[in-house]
């Protein structure tokens, strides 16, 4: 059932429930990492765009950071390359970096901007190379099997600094920044940065009220596959150690935890496969995922 199918009475109740949250978060910044099925399913894409526009219209400052894994994989396959991941990070040689920048900074970013604008928003597409607002350096991963050794994953970046000036100007003009996770090095080199990490760091720098990460799962799941609605750093460490959390969830969890520890008041990992998941998480009493607690 969609919102359009609800009875007038139920719709009124939903709006009444949302009012305190609209008052509470008016003028606040919410950073949204957009990825997963919500980016590939046409109906979910429309729901997401409408959610973003509505939240902006009622007075929230929305900043969107997006991924684009499936689209990158599709183009890599067309040029005869296969994606490789280590500890949730995409191994990025020079040719892969060209594909990543083409897909994220071109195709995906502009598609999202266009979709939001079609639904009445004023979205502006950016990469971290615009105004050099995301400065990065080469990331080397620790080899978990051989402590002390490092793994070279190519042109994968680690954030050095984020200049919020450009985003602040867009927010003040009621524009919605849509950011592709590409950074620039001190000598102009291009870096592919994990989108969850970029979203988390932007949330920290902007002193955002909330960071919301959309995923293809209900949230953080325990060993039995059951949803954990709230999780602490200690629990996260235990789940990483025993392998419950692994792969692509590692940078997501790490980013969420860092944001929670560095002043972002609400950090949520939610199910992007749910219609209007963003509205449900922000404007209702019961969210649709996992909240990361700072302690």
From Swiss-Prot:
Enzyme class: transferase
GO molecular function, one term: ATP binding
Keyword Transferase: yes
Localization per Swiss-Prot or TrEMBL: Cytoplasm
Pathway: Amino-acid biosynthesis; L-arginine biosynthesis; N(2)-acetyl-L-ornithine from L-glutamate: step 2/4
Residue sites binding substrate per the record: 68-69, 90, 192
Cell wall biogenesis/degradation recorded as keyword: no
Keywords from the UniProt entry: Amino-acid biosynthesis, Arginine biosynthesis, ATP-binding, Cytoplasm, Kinase, Nucleotide-binding, Transferase
A Pfam family that the UniProt record links to this protein: AA_kinase
Stored SUPFAM superfamilies: Carbamate kinase-like
Major subcellular site: cytoplasm
Site (Transition state stabilizer): 33, 252
InterPro entries assigned: AceGlu_kinase-like_sf, AcgluKinase_fam, ArgB, Asp/Glu/Uridylate_kinase, Glu/AcGlu_kinase, NAGK-C
Reactions listed under catalytic activity: N-acetyl-L-glutamate + ATP = N-acetyl-L-glutamyl 5-phosphate + ADP
EC number: 2.7.2.8
One annotated GO biological process: arginine biosynthetic process via ornithine
GO cellular component: a single term: cytoplasm
Matches recorded under PANTHER family: N-ACETYLGLUTAMATE SYNTHASE, N-ACETYLGLUTAMATE SYNTHASE, MITOCHONDRIAL
Job of this protein: Catalyzes the ATP-dependent phosphorylation of N-acetyl-L-glutamate.
Family in the record: Belongs to the acetylglutamate kinase family. ArgB subfamily.
Name of the protein described by the UniProt record: Acetylglutamate kinase
Organism: Dechloromonas aromatica (strain RCB)
């Amino acid at each position: 059932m969609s919102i359009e199918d609800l009875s007038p009475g139920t719709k009124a109740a939903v709006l009444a429930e949302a009012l305190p949250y609209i008052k509470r978060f008016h003028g606040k910044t919410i950073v949204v990492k957009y990825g997963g099925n919500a980016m590939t399913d046409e109906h979910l894409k429309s729901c997401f765009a409408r959610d973003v526009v509505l939240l902006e219209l009622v007075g929230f400052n929305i900043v969107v950071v997006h991924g684009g894994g499936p689209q990158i994989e599709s183009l890599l396959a067309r040029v005869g390359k296969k994606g490789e991941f280590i500890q949730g990070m995409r191994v990025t040689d020079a040719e892969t970096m060209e594909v990543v920048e083409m897909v994220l900074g071109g195709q995906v970013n502009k598609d999202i901007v266009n979709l939001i604008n079609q639904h009445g928003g004023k979205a502006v597409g950016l990469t971290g190379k615009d105004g050099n607002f995301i400065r990065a350096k080469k990331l080397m991963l620790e080899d978990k099997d051989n402590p002390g050794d490092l793994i070279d994953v190519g042109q994968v970046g680690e954030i050095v600094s984020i200049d919020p000036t450009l985003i602040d100007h867009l927010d003040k003009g009621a524009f919605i920044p849509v950011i592709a996770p590409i950074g620039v090095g001190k000598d102009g080199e291009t870096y592919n940065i994990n989108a969850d990490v970029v979203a988390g760091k932007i949330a920290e720098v902007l002193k955002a009220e909330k960071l919301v990460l959309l995923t293809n799962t209900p949230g953080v799941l325990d060993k039995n596959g059951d949803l954990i609605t709230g999780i602490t750093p200690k629990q996260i460490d235990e789940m990483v150690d025993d392998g419950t959390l692994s792969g692509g969830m590692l940078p997501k969890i790490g980013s969420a935890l860092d944001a929670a520890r560095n002043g972002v008041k609400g950090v949520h990992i939610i199910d992007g496969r749910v219609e209007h998941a963003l509205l449900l998480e922000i404007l209702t009493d019961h969210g649709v995922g996992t909240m990361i607690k700072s302690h």
